[in-house]
């Protein structure tokens, strides 16, 4: 059916056009004349019928009855050249209007999309004013540890003078108060740029570690960022103190073989020893393969020849999902016991603040500490912690360790359906975040009776064998405010969370808060595999690029990066044009902000790569690490040699290393028909300290 406007135009043209012609018995006459004749016959048909004799028909009784026979008229509309041209113009005009309407709708959609992008980049206005005349408070921010003040917004611990003065006027008003930076990080996911250099962070950490008292150092590394997460000056920073290395974020890595955790642990041992740390006595270092040599022919040339830092142990954990945390606590209580303070050290974004909060809720902190101490600020933005945060360590008396072991054995016999609905919901959420999930609990909690008489109670830790003063088991939390008294912290040893040390040549320093949230993986990584031929190019957002220049056969390229960071495949002749057109826009996603953002973003710098002796279609020969944005595991055909070219932004580092997950190419589905990509496959999450469903 024609649209109403078009039908109206055609009808008007029909009425204005020439008179239609009809054909009857081979004679052409106008429709108007035929209509008049028909009307005349209709008006006289009654009289004609009454004048016929009975039984006669209208045709049989009249010689001219043939003229009265019923016949069908078919109008024959004949258009002259002028009307035909008019109709074509009208159709052309209608088509133009439809095209204009489509362009208008598309323009409105683009405007709405730009408005949404602009809303995402909207800056929350920082209100308030500084007052340099007001002295610092002497009270630290409960989120980052910086001293609260209102003098300079660029100095850590700043609060607007209006809020600072009103809080000081109230008794205890600055207690548990967070600075403006922590507030914006938590509530608006925005980070204020502070005037704090890497040298200031190093000096703060070094000053804490130079204390003469015995101390244990927990050095946390990001497994996704090996080997760049190991600081080259770590031995000089730690000194002669004992050291335990914690490989964090193991929950984000998929299982490529059944023994992959043991292989990752051995790999971490090798990386730490290669960084200049002394292994413990009796440790046998695995033989290094040819593919593990640093590029450029140098073999740790910049590392100190002598080191006094002894590496006691290496452990894999997940501070977020709790995997390995209970085992870490048991190891610390058995080996270190209560001999001194413990310092948590590491680079930015390693997950130190997350582990601090997890241990605060565990048996490693005194029962009252979990009620009295606020949690550290957690954010993907580098350098969240700006000063030392601490909690008192629980003294592992024989009674406490006995009760703890009873709880761990009881927890290990429970099945998922035995847990409360709240615990089940928490575990289901953690399974979505990581492949390895563990339960972290508390053996003792602070009771209501103890809260009421806290000011008059002696410290339980100072009476190691006085079981009457032990915290009671499992009690509900109260909303009453709890404070640590001098008796609680008398002769106590502390667990310190130190500021993160900024890594040099890291791509995260070039990104905004929104871009960091996209690039840093927070959920279990799903590998994405592509089969590329020579002459093809792989883009990881607009942050990295790998050109496949030469090879005898196709090869597999497996991307291990944040699931939100897009991968785009194109040909070598189109790669430059595609980058110039789509960098900063939706297709490549990061950076965000269009041409204006890319104008200040460093250009990509190339570096040639040669990979020799492919091991076959089931084992990668090397990882190409694109700074901290992720890596690509390359799997050539057997004995094939590949010539590649990698790109990263200027000022960042591209690293070729032994494959961290050499068999990750096997974690894929079927190849997508007509595409170079394979369907993704997510391995199931593994639950520890919990029985399978009964």
Curated annotation (Swiss-Prot):
Q: How does it sit in the membrane?
A: Peripheral membrane protein
Keyword list (alphabetical) reads: Apoptosis, GTP-binding, Membrane, Mitochondrion, Mitochondrion inner membrane, Nucleotide-binding, Phosphoprotein
Ranges of biased composition (kind: Basic and acidic residues): 93-114
* Disulfide-linked positions: none
Residue segments, region Disordered? 38-69, 93-138, 280-305
Q: Which Gene3D superfamilies match?
A: P-loop containing nucleotide triphosphate hydrolases
Alphabetical list of SUPFAM superfamilies matching this protein: P-loop containing nucleoside triphosphate hydrolases
State whether keyword Electron transport applies: no
Provide one Gene Ontology cellular component: mitochondrial inner membrane
Localization, per the record, is: Mitochondrion inner membrane
One Pfam entry name: MMR_HSR1
Q: Which PROSITE patterns match?
A: G_CP
Residues that the record marks as modified (Phosphotyrosine) are: 77
**What GO biological process, any one, is recorded here?**
apoptotic process
Query: What is the top-level taxon of the source organism?
Result: Eukaryota
Keyword Ubl conjugation set for record: no
- Record's function text: Involved in regulation of mitochondrial protein translation and respiration. Plays a role in mitochondria-mediated cell death. May act as a scaffolding protein or stabilizer of respiratory chain supercomplexes. Binds GTP.
Family statement? Belongs to the TRAFAC class YlqF/YawG GTPase family. NOA1 subfamily.
Q: Which PANTHER family match?
A: NITRIC OXIDE-ASSOCIATED PROTEIN 1
Quaternary structure note: Homodimer or multimer. Interacts with mitochondrial complex I, DAP3, MRPL12 and MRPS27.
Q: What is this protein called?
A: Nitric oxide-associated protein 1
Source organism of the structure: Bos taurus (Bovine)
The coding gene here is: NOA1
